[in-house]
UniProtKB/Swiss-Prot annotation:
<feature type="compositionally biased region" description="Basic and acidic residues">
    <location>
        <begin position="265"/>
        <end position="279"/>
    </location>
</feature>
<keyword id="KW-0934">Plastid</keyword>
<keyword id="KW-0627">Porphyrin biosynthesis</keyword>
<protein>
    <recommendedName>
        <fullName>Protoporphyrinogen oxidase, chloroplastic</fullName>
        <ecNumber>1.3.3.4</ecNumber>
    </recommendedName>
</protein>
<dbReference type="InterPro" id="IPR004572">
    <property type="entry name" value="Protoporphyrinogen_oxidase"/>
</dbReference>
<dbReference type="GO" id="GO:0004729">
    <property type="term" value="F:oxygen-dependent protoporphyrinogen oxidase activity"/>
</dbReference>
<dbReference type="GO" id="GO:0009507">
    <property type="term" value="C:chloroplast"/>
</dbReference>
<feature type="binding site">
    <location>
        <begin position="123"/>
        <end position="126"/>
    </location>
    <ligand>
        <name>FAD</name>
    </ligand>
</feature>
<keyword id="KW-0285">Flavoprotein</keyword>
<dbReference type="GO" id="GO:0015995">
    <property type="term" value="P:chlorophyll biosynthetic process"/>
</dbReference>
<keyword id="KW-0809">Transit peptide</keyword>
<dbReference type="InterPro" id="IPR036188">
    <property type="entry name" value="FAD/NAD-bd_sf"/>
</dbReference>
<feature type="transit peptide" description="Chloroplast">
    <location>
        <begin position="1"/>
        <end position="50"/>
    </location>
</feature>
<keyword id="KW-0560">Oxidoreductase</keyword>
<comment type="pathway">
    <text>Porphyrin-containing compound metabolism; protoporphyrin-IX biosynthesis; protoporphyrin-IX from protoporphyrinogen-IX: step 1/1.</text>
</comment>
<dbReference type="InterPro" id="IPR002937">
    <property type="entry name" value="Amino_oxidase"/>
</dbReference>
<keyword id="KW-0149">Chlorophyll biosynthesis</keyword>
Length: 548
């Protein structure tokens, strides 16, 4: 996943909102859960379910000599969504670039699978349709393939055994039953500034929210929200780094409401550039995908890049060139290849970038090695429509974006996406497709569980609030475990990132840039927005480089 939850992260509530090659089912049907509940390796009567553990993304550290040299403006290391989008943006003005990927497929954590009438995601599941995200889709020829969720579809949080709707607009605040009246009053007074003053040091998400909005908002909304976005621990996540826009409201306006009014005033007084008329106009707060899943975006960019995208190219070393720029050595299917480039963008995970950069800057490598990526499992299962509890049905159907589960509510699953309700053509008629996330910073023990154990946990959890207790066992569509899933923006994250960049500068690594979800943010939309930002940095450098 590049976030997201959950990242780049895959998440059902956010509106900001490391994978192995695809492995498909060997037969044209899915296996009932009852057939695998006591098995570690799944193979019953010829049926085989698609269950896999994502392999670590590794880059060889040994230097390799030889191979022809080629002069390039930029080499982008890593063909996840960040690297691909940087290349897409830059290629208009700097077509003399290359994107290299150690694995045999592009797209990073985006993993869309289609089989037997089901279409599901095993990494990020959707994106916020922001203008940068929509611009990228339109520029890649995907405007007609965009699909948007119903903005009126409810979102739920599990609390005291019931799935309770989250308010989607201000008029809902007085009536929703997720919080008590005292809790609502505490949040309201805190939002206008009647709360303890900031402590003068960087706060965790939990500290910031409890101080500004009270314990109920934290426990019943923000804690599960953090699980959905980061699969993280809000007592350790940095408010400034993880939710910077909200943090800035208090910083600039003295309170959350004060900052909101100030931001509105500044926007109204600032001339606004005309919106690109090519872009669709999403209604309300919704999320988006594509007709054939998120995979369509990296596939479209890959097709546009053509021979500029190199797969199964394993970076062995980077050295500074005497004539300026950098010398890169790769192990490729064709043998050892050497490249000469004026600039490099590292969009691989921070722990991979750390290993590659260590010969160039020990301090930068040490800083990048500090970021933590907890494991997350994506368990996709399907039930017949009649398995859904009657109270969860609207007009005979399950409707909504999905549900999140606070850690205090006695379930292990982080949350569930209603995949077949969110977007069209995700499951056959009469079937409900559910994408469930499990693991995260508070539950790394999932790495010791088998796929059947993960499915058993998810099925048991769902029968507590969504599925009828005596419903038939689910069919298992896919199980994917990401050992290092989502970078955690912990307290000190921004300082650590600044330390890495400063060390690179101190070591004279001009023209070497960092990108990816640990830099931009974990949501898919933030990766795309971050790609525009990094592309602007690189093109600015190349413009200056041309005059040296």
């Amino acid at each position: 996943m590049t976030t997201t939850p959950i990242a780049n992260h895959p998440n059902i509530f956010t509106h900001q909102s490391s994978s192995s090659p695809l492995a498909f089912l060997n037969r044209t049907s899915f296996i009932p859960f009852s057939s695998i509940s006591k098995r570690n390796s799944v193979n019953c009567n010829g049926w085989r379910t698609r269950c896999s553990v994502a392999k670590d993304y590794t880059v060889p550290s040994s230097a390799v000599d030889g191979g022809p040299a080629a002069e390039l403006d930029c080499v982008i290391v890593g063909a996840g969504i960040s690297g691909l989008c940087i290349a897409q943006v830059m290629s208009a003005n700097y077509p003399n670039l290359m994107v290299t990927e150690a694995r045999d497929r592009a797209g990073g954590n985006i993993t869309t699978v289609e089989r037997d009438g089901y279409l599901w995601e095993e990494g990020p599941n959707s994106f916020q349709p922001s203008d940068p995200m929509l611009t990228m889709a339109v520029d890649c020829g995907l405007k007609d393939d965009l699909v948007l969720g119903d903005p009126n579809a409810p979102r739920f949080v599990l609390w005291k055994g019931k799935l309770r709707p989250v308010p989607s607009k201000l008029t809902d605040l007085a009536f929703f039953d997720l919080m008590s009246i005292p809790g609502k009053l505490r949040a309201g007074f805190g939002a206008i500034g009647l709360r303890p003053s900031p402590p003068g040091h960087e706060e965790s998400v939990e500290q910031f929210v409890r101080r500004n909005l009270g314990g109920e908002v934290f426990e019943r909304l923000i804690e599960p929200f953090c699980s959905g976005v980061y699969a993280g621990d809000p007592s350790k996540l940095s408010m400034k780094a993880a939710f910077g826009k909200v943090w800035k409201l208090e910083e600039t306006g003295g309170s959350i409401i004060g900052g909101t009014f100030k931001a509105i005033k500044e926007r109204s007084s600032t001339p606004k550039a005309p919106r690109d008329p090519r872009l669709p106009k999403p209604k309300g707060q919704t999320v988006g995908s594509f007709r054939k899943g998120l995979r369509m975006l990296p596939d479209a960019i890959s097709a546009r890049l053509g021979s500029k995208l190199k797969l199964s190219w394993k970076l062995s070393s980077i050295t500074k060139s005497e004539k300026g720029g950098y010398h890169l050595t790769y192990e490729t299917p064709e043998g050892v290849v050497s490249l000469q480039s004026r600039s490099i963008v590292m969009t691989v995970p921070s722990y991979v970038a750390s290993n590659i950069l260590r010969p160039l800057s020990v301090a930068a490598a040490d800083a990048l090695s500090n970021f933590y990526y907890p494991p997350v499992g994506a368990v996709t299962i399907t039930y017949p429509q009649e398995a859904i509890r009657d109270e969860r049905l609207v007009d005979g159907e399950l409707k909504g974006f999905g549900q999140l589960h606070p850690r205090t509510q006695g379930v292990e699953t982080l949350g569930t996406i209603y995949s077949s309700s969110l977007f069209p053509n995700r499951a056959p008629k009469g079937r409900v497709l559910l994408l469930n996330y499990i693991g995260g910073a508070k539950n790394p023990e999932i790495l010791s569980k088998t796929e059947s154990q993960l499915v058993e946990v998810v099925d048991r959890d769902l029968r507590k609030m969504l599925i009828k207790p005596k419903a038939q066992d689910p069919l298992v569509v896919g199980v994917r475990v990401w050992p290092q899933a989502i970078p955690q923006f912990l307290v000190g994250h921004l300082d650590t990132l600044s330390t890495a960049k400063a060390a690179m500068n101190d070591n004279g690594l001009e023209g070497l840039f960092l990108g990816g979800n640990y830099v931009s943010g974990v949501a898919l939309g933030r990766c795309v927005e971050g790609a525009y930002e990094v592309a602007s940095e690189v093109t600015g450098f190349l413009s200056r480089y041309a005059y040296k």
